[in-house]
Amino acid sequence: MEGNKLEEQDSSPPQSTPGLMKGNKREEQGLGPEPAAPQQPTAEEEALIEFHRSYRELFEFFCNNTTIHGAIRLVCSQHNRMKTAFWAVLWLCTFGMMYWQFGLLFGEYFSYPVSLNINLNSDKLVFPAVTICTLNPYRYPEIKEELEELDRITEQTLFDLYKYSSFTTLVAGSRSRRDLRGTLPHPLQRLRVPPPPHGARRARSVASSLRDNNPQVDWKDWKIGFQLCNQNKSDCFYQTYSSGVDAVREWYRFHYINILSRLPETLPSLEEDTLGNFIFACRFNQVSCNQANYSHFHHPMYGNCYTFNDKNNSNLWMSSMPGINNGLSLMLRAEQNDFIPLLSTVTGARVMVHGQDEPAFMDDGGFNLRPGVETSISMRKETLDRLGGDYGDCTKNGSDVPVENLYPSKYTQQVCIHSCFQESMIKECGCAYIFYPRPQNVEYCDYRKHSSWGYCYYKLQVDFSSDHLGCFTKCRKPCSVTSYQLSAGYSRWPSVTSQEWVFQMLSRQNNYTVNNKRNGVAKVNIFFKELNYKTNSESPSVTMVTLLSNLGSQWSLWFGSSVLSVVEMAELVFDLLVIMFLMLLRRFRSRYWSPGRGGRGAQEVASTLASSPPSHFCPHPMSLSLSQPGPAPSPALTAPPPAYATLGPRPSPGGSAGASSSTCPLGGP
């Protein structure tokens, strides 16, 4: 009976234990002493996810199946170590060169280079705004007495320094010149300075070159300037100039600004001024101008100014034809009656071309017109569109610039710079500079109210020029700019043969007699040279499409592969990480099942089995060996079979006939 049971056990198919790694699957042979039939191999069960059991197997599989050129040579030449080493070094060098090129391409992309695209367009053009000034600072009736007093003090100063006197306003009599000079703060002085450190020969050449303008000053020892101090007189300096002309003009300008600051906001004298006092004739596209085509304002240094075709014009001028006859033509009065000779030393007019929504900065962009000359100014329009963001530091409308726009116009870099200086002036000096707009509730600078504003202003001007105020850094360039490239031509006007009838007609038409014929008039023509205008636009030099194309070209150059090869490389890296993780997991588990802890582990297993209820089935010795850490058992069992007699039923201690127990070995055979 027992023999029959043993034969049934031998004829049962062996159990198999699947492993964790690929290729780790085993088949157990029958344990019977004499198998009745050959053992049939059991089909391996394929797992959903299988991994290679070693790095060597992984690299061999990759090199045999990848589409990357040269990788298969590492496997095909494995029996020749020299070839294997050669191809390995070549493959690694090629791989390194490719990724070096990749680094250059990514570096170029993240530097955000731009390309300049130039397009030539042709269409009807909006005529720009034109501002023209008289170059004649105005003597306001409201401050006439103060200006006359300043003229008398200036003449006395020139007489004391240069022995020069030509004005008819000089006051002689009981009031001495010294008393007259003492009535004005910050007097102009002649200051002794040490000789220059370089040789006397160089000093003599400098002195001789400057002595013509200032005959009373020895330039080895003297300079002209005026003293400025802070509020408590603890710090003072001299604002000096090497030229007496520059010193007198700047000193006069400084006092003139203080007088202008006392004017009220609105002046009736400015409203009474009309265009006919300055412009004899005005035509655009052969049509006469009218009062609705211009606006008037006053500049402290350039006098009365008129802006044609500005944003206040309801119908902006359009140019549909180029040429001198299809633009703006003006006949100007260039005489300077009732002018301020110490403030303005030139005659003629000053003109500037700008956009409709831009203020006219006559100091920055204007140029002068000569009397007795016809000036023809041809224009060519250009637009520039910059890229913002990572590609360039520009602003669209100035809303992201930390400077308040004090001008009633759109954002430009000049508007921002002047507003920034005015903000610094108000913050440091406590008053506003009269040449720039001011915020509400802020007064213009006047040494009667702000005694040290001149000291603060000239110090601030030095910091502004050296960009210590940060205005040039804060004020970014606008992303969209429209400019006009100007070129001027000059001709004598009127000619000798035509000047008689021209002056006669001008005098009768305007009820004005030209005293000095040629020096009293000027003419200017402003027109488009051509209707073709150039558009300069920036575009990214390296886009994402260009970057991917360059990367693909480099990959094909060094490996002759495609984008699927990149996926293969990603799969290789993923498999490497998985194998590394599994090896670390094995090492982590082996720390708790190390040989030094084997006795303790066996005791724990024995106690667990002893405390468990009896079972009718015994685990296979191979499964027990696999459940314990250590080297995997051999697929073929060479040890003798266990004692089968011990597997028979034994009577229970209680003598129960139906109960049976079995004794199972914990280890292998």
Curated annotation (Swiss-Prot):
Database matches in NCBIfam families: ENaC
Concerning its family, UniProt says:
Belongs to the amiloride-sensitive sodium channel (TC 1.A.6) family. SCNN1A subfamily.
Query: How is the polypeptide modified once translated?
Result: Ubiquitinated. Can be ubiquitinated at multiple sites and undergo monoubiquitination and polyubiquitination. Ubiquitination by NEDD4 or NEDD4L inhibits the ENaC channel through endocytosis, intracellular retention and degradation of its individual subunits. ENaC is activated through the proteolytic maturation of its subunits. Furin cleaves the SCNN1A subunit, which results in a stepwise increase in the open probability of the channel due to the release of an inhibitory tract. BPIFA1, which is recruited by the SCNN1B subunit, prevents the proteolytic activation of ENaC.
Q: List the disulfide bonds.
A: C133-C305, C229-C236, C282-C289, C394-C479, C416-C456, C416-C475, C420-C471, C429-C456, C429-C479, C431-C445
What does altering F61L do? In BESC2; hypoactive mutation resulting in reduction of protein expression and a significant decrease of amiloride-sensitive sodium currents
Catalytic activity, per the record? Na(+)(in) = Na(+)(out)
- In Swiss-Prot or TrEMBL terms, this protein is called Epithelial sodium channel subunit alpha
Give the regulation of activity.
Originally identified and characterized by its inhibition by the diuretic drug amiloride. Inhibited by phenamil.
Q: What ranges does the Cytoplasmic topological domain annotation cover?
A: 1-85, 584-669
Outcome of mutating C394S, per the record? Answer: Increased channel activity
Give the disease entry from the UniProt record. Answer: Pseudohypoaldosteronism 1B1, autosomal recessive: A form of pseudohypoaldosteronism type 1, a rare salt wasting disease resulting from target organ unresponsiveness to mineralocorticoids. The disorder affects multiple organs, and is characterized by an often fulminant presentation in the neonatal period with dehydration, hyponatremia, hyperkalemia, metabolic acidosis, failure to thrive and weight loss.
Q: Has the keyword Membrane been applied to this entry?
A: yes
Give me the gene this protein comes from.
SCNN1A
- Give the organism the record lists: Homo sapiens (Human)
Q: What is the lineage of its organism?
A: Eukaryota, Metazoa, Chordata, Craniata, Vertebrata
Gene Ontology CC? acrosomal vesicle; apical plasma membrane; ciliary membrane; cytoplasm; cytosol; external side of plasma membrane; extracellular exosome; motile cilium
Q: Where is this motif: PY motif?
A: 640-644
On assembly, the entry states: Heterotrimer; containing an alpha/SCNN1A, a beta/SCNN1B and a gamma/SCNN1G subunit. Interacts with WWP1 (via WW domains). Interacts with WWP2 (via WW domains); inhibits the channel. Interacts with BPIFA1; the interaction is indirect via SCNN1B and inhibits the proteolytic processing of SCNN1A and SCNN1G and the activation of ENaC. Interacts with the full-length immature form of PCSK9 (pro-PCSK9); inhibits ENaC by promoting its proteasomal degradation.
